Amino acid sequence: MFPALSGAAIRQTFLDFYAQRGHQVLPSASLVPEDPTVLLTIAGMLPFKPIFLGQRDPEYPRVTTAQKCVRTNDIENVGRTARHHTFFEMLGNFSFGDYFKKEAIAWAWELVTEVFGLPPERLVVSVFREDEEAFALWRDEIGIPAHRIQRMGEADNFWAAGPTGPCGPCSEIYYDFKPELGDERIDLEDDSRFLEIYNLVFMELNRDSEGHLMPLAKQNIDTGLGLERLAQVLQGVPNNYETDLIFPIIQTAAGIAGLNYSKANPEQQISLKVIGDHARAVMHLIADGVLPSNVDRGYVLRRLIRRMVRHGRLLGIGEPFTIPVIETAIQLAEAAYPQVRERETLIKTELQREEEQFLKTLERGERLLLDLFTAVESSRRDSSSPKQISGADAFKLFDTYGFPLELTQEIAQEHGFSVDLEGFEQEMEKQRQRARAAHQTIDLTAQGSLDELADFLSQTEFLGYSQSSARGVVEALLVEGKSVPQVEAGQAVQVVLDRTPFYAEAGGQIGDRGYLSGDGLLVRIEDVQKQGDLFVHFGRVERGILRVGDPVQAQIDLACRRRAQAHHTATHLLQAALKRIVDPSIGQAGSLVAFDRLRFDFTLSRPVTPEELEQIENLVNTWIAEAHAAQVAIMPLAEAKARGAVAMFGEKYGAEVRVIDFPGVSMELCGGTHVNNTAEIGLFKIIAETGVAAGIRRIEAVAGPAVLEYLNERDRVVRELSAQFKAKPQELPERVAALQAELKAAQKELEEVRSQLALLQAEGLLAQAVAVADLKVLVAELGSTTPEALKTAAEHLLHKLGEGAVVLGSVPEAGKVSLVAAFSPAVQQLGLKAGSFIGEIAKLTGGGGGGRPNLAQAGGKQPEKLAEALQVARERLQAELISR
């Protein structure tokens, strides 16, 4: 019997095997791919797709990887089959014009039989039906009987990147779980018996636009071995979920739910498997920089988190539970993927926030559904009428409240209702049409023209690292997105030059300003953007005529450039100081380098304290005063990382990178412009520290001349305040504090007066109370009473009435409605809750609200509808109390 290797051992054994055969071991690429055509890394070969398509030269002739992958196209099957996942690891070996079929087949067979110890008699292989070479290699070189080599069609065993381009046949190795059935009944479609574990793709052909296949000049190998699948086989467990890669996560979730996995019913086991699978996907997605949102990969992440929470709820877990689950996932993954522990705080913060928000969504959605059930029941003519939630209502729950359709169906079924799925889909299609119409209004002419021009223009040569002025030739002109031969004075224009000293906006640094000049010509440049390899200068012709083909002198505004350089270098120093003083694991999450300020976003789950900010500011100014000289070098990416250069997380870098090094202080990968010496910055001042998103903080600061401008503006404000308060600058804090105390006392006194007035008015309302059964109901309007005074009056009136219900409304100011409901214990025992009741009444005034079962407040913005809303409240209360 083969050895029961751990998942980690399988991964390392695979990589070591191919490393010993001349393959370069590369780390997993990010789940956020470079390929703009896909949202997520869905296959082991995706990071190498540009090489396979001939768009990039390989750094190594053969490589091997363990690649993180996420696919959600079969998300509904997760947990229901033995091997469907959203997150999985694909082990692969790749050849770029080096070895081909013979070696790939021989090594794959050696690995699975001799290294992993799978019995040859339990393995079956498949080949493309026309690939005689692969068939012969398996039969003659490897020695597999012909009847255990299955010929398959193009749909199963032929790979292509698209309708045209590189393609080729595949060959797969399958494991046989039921060899006792014999070789007479080999059907690779029977996934209860056969499990595909290794896929070999032989890229040897190129398909042209007419569908003709021609041999490739360079033949490539692309393989994939599913780690979870091989772990299932080697560990002798019935499915991928019970391997050591996932099962500890499942056990953690089961423990929280108070379940024993082996004794759980099938539906409970499915929910536990979903949680185990999704936890891994969520962890790696957030670690790779994806944050929950309503678009693109952010929506994929949000959906996965919500499915985790929903399945936890199906297991009876009513409270937040995902943090201990994700901690188990981190423990399992951190040895192979250290970044999951490094980004633990971000992962847990985002997950906890999303979980808590969705639990509120679930609670709100369930309340709304119960109201819908009541409304449908009351509108049914007789018992034969269908108990169905309309597609429009189900879509509103989904679109407005984020309530999943499948959860609407599930709860509806529990209450004997169905959901109009066809109507839901019609509403969804209406939304798609609205989205398409919105997208069609976007003007894409400029980008389209640039894309067309790029086919005829060479890349712009950038001279700005060493030159502030340079001669260039106008290669293209665009006006309102259209290519033109010339532009006259007064017109706005986009200019493409063959060479330029102007820096184009990139890496957070804004583009240069300056001029283009020539014989009788002056063009003011206000911005520079990079479109592919072209630098596009945005400006206006102030004098003369600018023509395509004209030679011009390009001159940047040196004062603006120096300000940008000071702020860019200061940003590097700021990041270095943050890492030293606050947390070495801090990573950049975004930046702005402008002429008048800098903004730096970074990963941190808490605010930076005032003491830390002062230390950071002092350290940066110390480095400035120490006059550290910049060292700029171009080097291989691997060498830069080995030297400790800081890279922006999620940024895509080429094989060669530019490194900005202030030795002993800061070393970063950066394509921006910088000072030659930190002393050129002059001074650095932090002006704000704020939060911009969960787990993301922001520091705004100024450097160089901008510090003086900031201080002058602050002094002006202080002088104005001193004059207004008739106090010296140093006396302002004390004077403001005294005024705040006086204002607070006056407001408190005024509120007390208002409350007393409301109580006096309320006394006169007692006579309006009506008896309903053994209870009393009082619904009334109380003038312009404030919300706080209205609440006091409601509590007072209920106390006077004894058992009953009080609903009061007022118009505290123009355009606003205040409502309050106070219910006694006897009313609550009948099933009426003040919070939900007053929330529904508030909707009639264009608002909402809620609160506790005994006391709740709400508001609206349509005072003209207050009387009507109070009448509805009166009628509903009386009807509800009579019927119960």
Curated annotation (Swiss-Prot):
Zn(2+) binds at H568, H572, C670, H674. SUPFAM superfamilies: Class II aaRS and biotin synthetases, Putative anticodon-binding domain of alanyl-tRNA synthetase (AlaRS), ThrRS/AlaRS common domain, Translation proteins. The keyword Transmembrane does not apply. One of its GO terms (molecular function) is alanine-tRNA ligase activity. Its EC number is 6.1.1.7. CDD domains: AlaRS_core. GO terms for cellular component: cytosol. InterPro entries: aa-tRNA-synth_II/BPL/LPL, Ala-tRNA-lgiase_IIc, Ala-tRNA-ligase_IIc_anticod-bd, Ala-tRNA-synth_IIc_core, Ala-tRNA-synth_IIc_N, Ala-tRNA_ligase, Ala_tRNA_ligase_euk/bac, DHHA1_dom. Binds 1 zinc ion per subunit. It is found in: Cytoplasm. Signal peptide: none annotated. Its cofactor is Zn(2+). Gene3D superfamilies: 2.40.30.130, 3.10.310.40, 3.30.54.20, 6.10.250.550, Bira Bifunctional Protein, Domain 2, Threonyl-trna Synthetase, Chain A, domain 2. Its main location: cytoplasm. Disulfide bonds: none annotated. Keywords: Aminoacyl-tRNA synthetase, ATP-binding, Cytoplasm, Ligase, Metal-binding, Nucleotide-binding, Protein biosynthesis, RNA-binding, tRNA-binding, Zinc. One of its GO terms (biological process) is alanyl-tRNA aminoacylation. It catalyses: tRNA(Ala) + L-alanine + ATP = L-alanyl-tRNA(Ala) + AMP + diphosphate. PANTHER family: ALANINE--TRNA LIGASE, CYTOPLASMIC (PTHR11777:SF9), ALANYL-TRNA SYNTHETASE (PTHR11777). Catalyzes the attachment of alanine to tRNA(Ala) in a two-step reaction: alanine is first activated by ATP to form Ala-AMP and then transferred to the acceptor end of tRNA(Ala). Also edits incorrectly charged Ser-tRNA(Ala) and Gly-tRNA(Ala) via its editing domain. Consists of three domains; the N-terminal catalytic domain, the editing domain and the C-terminal C-Ala domain. The editing domain removes incorrectly charged amino acids, while the C-Ala domain, along with tRNA(Ala), serves as a bridge to cooperatively bring together the editing and aminoacylation centers thus stimulating deacylation of misacylated tRNAs. Belongs to the class-II aminoacyl-tRNA synthetase family. This is Alanine--tRNA ligase.
